[in-house]
C-alpha cells in the first residue's frame, strides 16, 4: 500500500510541476527553492526535536545501532523499485549521504530531470524507517501515531491544545441571582451519562476528573462538545431529561405539564389507530384552535325583492334563491297548502309559482323569451299563409288523403288513379305505411296520401287528416260504414276538412248505394242525392268506373278552397314517415306545406336536426328544389325524426344544433321526474310482467304497435315496453334483451347477419311479423303463457279398505273393494276418514289377486300400495282422481 501511495505522490508532484511551468511560475519557484535550501542548511546543523527523540529512543533500546542501520537499507530497497534502478543501486553510505541534501526540496529546481525526482522519493522513504522502529520498540510511550507522508503534506499539523484557563468570577458580570449562568444551566440541565462502547482499533475515551470550579476537566474537543450539548436548548429532549422540581419556577419551557396522565388508563382513540400518539404525552401537544364565532345574520337586514322575473321550469331551490328565501320556507309554505315538494323538485306550473310569490309578497313575472326562441314559431301554416303578402302567393296542388276501413279498396283505388300496382306488393293485402305520391291527372297535379285502414294506425289517420286539404272517404258498397270509417270521419271533422265520399266496389252484385246514403245521413253527412252538401261518387277500382268523375270533384273542391302558398318563403312542413336506411342512415319522407326546400339547407325537427344532402321524389329521381304540396325523401339527418313532427328551415346548421341542444338540456332536466315509478299494486297482487323490445322499419309502425299493445288490458299480466326503435335487430339489442329477460318483436324488419348466432347462444326469444294483427295475437299468446295453468281435480273412482297386510319389504298393503268408478294405477289418491282428507299422493301399485293390473272397476277387489303413506286404517276411503291443467285467460 505504501508503494502505491508513494507512486501516486510522485505522479501528483510531476503533474503540479508541469502545471507550474506552463503557468510561467518557474522563476518564482526557483527563488522560493533557493530560500528553502538556505533554511534547510541551517536546520541540518541544528537537529530537530523529533530527531532528538528518535536518537534517545535508539539509545535506550537493547538492540545495537548497527542493526537498525542495517534494517533501513533493506526497507529502502524493499520499498523503492522505481523506474530507474541504477540510481538506487548505490551503497548504504551513498544513500545515507544523500539524505541531508534531499531534505531541501529540490523538486522545483529540476522538473524535467528524472534523477532528482527519484531523490525526492528517496527522501520520503528515508523518513518512514524513522517512525516504524519507534512504534515497534516503544509501544508504551504516549506518542501519537505519525501520519503517512502524503497526509502530512495534505493535512495541517494538529495544533497543541491549550490548557484550560481558570474562570475568574467577576461580581459585576453576575445576574440578579448572584450566580453565574453556567452554574445554573449545568445544574438544571445535566445530560445523563451514556454508555460508550469501545470499538477495537478506535481511541478509548477515559473519564476525566473535574476541577475545583466544578467544570469537567476534559480535552478541548470533548469539552467543547459537552458544552454545546449542555448549553444548547435545541439539543435537549424534555422527555429524556430528569424531572424538574415542581417548586421552582420554570423559565425556559412554556409547555410545562405538571399533570401526567397514567398510560394504562389512556383510552384508545382514532389517533392511536393511525399512529399519531406513538410519541407519548409530550409529543401530542397541539396548538389551541382559535374559536371563531358563527356569524348571525339578522333577518330584518336582508332585503327581499318585491318583483322578480324567472323562466319556467324552475326548481324549488332556484326559486327560493331568487326570492332571497330559504328553500325550507318555500317547502313549508307549499306543504301547508297541501303540496308536497323537496328541494330539487321542479315547478313547471305558472299558477304554483305565482301562488308562492303571493304568499311572500313578491310579484313574479314569467319570461317566455327562451321558449319562444326554441319554439321558432307559434303560428300555424294557415296563419302564416294568411299573413303573407297576397302578391307572393301562388296556387298549389291539393293534398288529398284517402281514408276508410281496412280492405275497402283504398290502395287499389289509388293505383287506378296513378296507373300503378302498389297493392300487390303489400304484406297481408293491407296498407301498413303512410304513402305520399304526386300524380298528374287530366284536371291537374294532385298529392295523394294513402293512410292505413287498420285500427292500429289511428295515429297515422289523424296525422293524414291534419296535413291534407280534402279527405276521400272510401266506403265499400257491399259492407257499409265500419268502425275505422267512423274514426276517419271524426278526424276529418276535427280538422275541419272537406269530405268526398267514394262508394267503392260498385261492380259487385250486392252493391247497395242507398244503404250507404242512409248510414251517412245518420252521422250528419247528408249526400247530395238526398239534398245535402256531401259529395258522393260511385267508383270501381277494378273496372275504373267513376274515376274521372272523382277527379273532377276533387278539382272542384280545390277551386272552392283556393289553396295557395308562398314558394319564396323558408320551407315548413310535416314528417310523413321516417326510417333507418342501411346505406343512407336516417331518412324521412316530408311534405312541404309552405315555402321551398333546397339542397344544403338546415332543418330543425322536434328532437333532431339535419342538413339536406339528397332529395328524391317518389320515382327516386334526384331533386334540387321542392315547392309546396310536394312530398320528398331527404337524407343527412342527425337522428330519426318521429312521424308527424313539424320541421322548419333555419339559417345554418350551427343554429339548428344550438336549438336542439337547448331542447335536449330541458328534457334531461325532467328525466328524473319522468321516470316510471314502480307499480306497487301489481307487486302486491303478484302480477306477471311481460317485457318487450320493439324494432320496426318505420316510425309509424312503432306508433301503431305501441298503441295496439297499450290497448291489451289484463288484470293478471302487465306489459312493459323497454325500448322501441327503427332499424334491424342488432347484436346490442339481443344482449340487452338477454340481460333484461325481454322478448324481441320485429315488425317489417330483419336480423343482422352477425347477430343471428347470438340468439341461440343467449337463448333470446325473437318474433318477426309482417302483419300487425298477427303481432298483436302473438303478444297475447306470450302473455297467456306467463300465467300458471289452473289445476282441476277430476274424480275417477273410490275404494274402501277392508284389510291391511303388513310386509317387511314394501310396508302396508291395503286390501280394498272398488265402490265407485275406476281405480287407475299411477293416478293421484286421496285418503279420507270421516269425510276428512288425511293425505294426498300417488297410487304406486295396483294388483288384482297376484297380477299387476292398470285399472280395477267397480265391485272388484284389489290390493293397493300407496307411495309413502302407511297410516291408513280399515274403513278409510281411497279416492282416485286425475289432475287436468287449464290455461288461464287474460
From Swiss-Prot:
Biased composition (Acidic residues): 114-128
Compositionally skewed regions (Basic and acidic residues) per UniProt: 42-54, 149-163, 242-266
Stretch list, region G5: 540-542
InterPro entries: EF-G-like_DII, EFTu-like_2, IF2_II, IF2_N, P-loop_NTPase, Small_GTP-bd, T_Tr_GTP-bd_dom, TF_IF2_bacterial-like
Region of interest (G3), residue spans: 450-453
Location of the region described as G1 in the Swiss-Prot/TrEMBL record: 404-411
Biased composition (Low complexity): 55-72
Domain of life assignment: Bacteria
Protein family membership: Belongs to the TRAFAC class translation factor GTPase superfamily. Classic translation factor GTPase family. IF-2 subfamily.
Function per UniProt: One of the essential components for the initiation of protein synthesis. Protects formylmethionyl-tRNA from spontaneous hydrolysis and promotes its binding to the 30S ribosomal subunits. Also involved in the hydrolysis of GTP during the formation of the 70S ribosomal complex.
Protein name in UniProt: Translation initiation factor IF-2
Protein source organism: Chlamydia pneumoniae (Chlamydophila pneumoniae)
